[in-house]
Amino acid sequence: GLKPTHVFMAFGSNDLETYGSNSSEFIAAYKTQIQKIQAALPDVPIYINCILPITDDAIAATPDLAYYPEYNDGLQTMCQEMGCTFIDNSSIIESSSENLYEPDGEHVIQDYYPKWLTHMAQVAGLQA
């Protein structure tokens, strides 16, 4: 079977539409997945990616998206409780000279992904 040395997880904005203001239910579902991984891979570090900022236009179109900061707060607390590392990727969006959003203002374009991969590797100490 697979023997990963690091696990990276990213659930996010699509779940905001499912859970709405109920971030605690989202966190509970996330914890369940992490517990399964920790049971199977007890010595493997787990990294949890933030939910990226969402544009005002996207929030106006889908008000439940406005809860993303609350979800990120819950993810940070969950990481502290479970011994995981929270990765805040918002600086990738905020520091970019280009608009990295799809027209929906919620999802990102292809150019985001190499930047994201590099950032995750840096946080995990996987890149010189």
Predicted segment positions?
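Internal catalytic-core helix/loop-beta-alpha segment
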Residues: 29-30, 41, 50
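Alpha-helical initiation/capping and key positions within long helical/coiled-coil segments
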Residues: 25, 29, 67-70
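Structural recognition of the beta-strand scaffold that forms the well-ordered cores
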Residues: 5-11, 45-50, 85-88
